[in-house]
Amino acid sequence: MSRNKKLRLLVTTKCPHHCPLCCNNSWNFDELPRVNRWNYQQIMITGGEPLIHPIKVQLLTETIRSITDMQGTNPEIFLYTSICDSRLDRILDSVNGIVLTPHNKDDVERFLKTNSRFLEMKGVGYWHTISLRLNLFKDIKEMLPEGVDLSLWKVKDMEWIKDCPVPEGEDFRRIENLW
């Protein structure tokens, strides 16, 4: 039996949004298996909203890097978040990429400021190595100004999926003690 190569790692169920169709509404997290291995090609840190706890996210990524270094593996680490402020800046040098999903008008306004700043820093430092992914639901996409430069981002149009099945080839696990 082959092992899955991607891990969706739940670190918290806390979230500032209360989306009626949120994937988390369809899971019993007490029954979700605990992570028991780290030899994945990709680890996706998710929640709830992980960046409610930016220091813990940073410590977790450092711990994962230490463990996988000893194992001789080097997984890509992605952070799934809706937060687009200084907390995001704090974690950027600890991950291979972010997957940002703005949820409301305030998120869009913060994203536009961050995007402008990122565009100014394009080509400086580690920016060429970071994967920037932007998930946009239709109503959020319509809030973006016409002609906004999204060239740094891999943009994915999103829609709510009932019951949110785990994609094939992925494990969905949680840390032992959720934040």
Spans of features found by a protein language model:
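Canonical Radical SAM [4Fe-4S] cluster-binding loop centered on the CxxxCxxC motif
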Residues: 1-32, 38
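Positively charged, amphipathic N-terminal segments that serve as targeting/anchoring signals
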Residues: 14, 66-67
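Core AdoMet radical
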Residues: 23-29, 39-53, 67-87, 94-114, ...
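Metal-dependent catalytic neighborhoods of phosphoester/phosphodiester hydrolases
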Residues: 54-58
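Charged helix-capping and loop-helix junction motifs
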Residues: 59-62, 113-114
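Glycine-enriched alpha-helix->loop->beta-strand junction motifs that scaffold or abut catalytic
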Residues: 92-99, 146-150
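Auxiliary Fe-S-binding modules of radical SAM enzymes
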Residues: 122-179
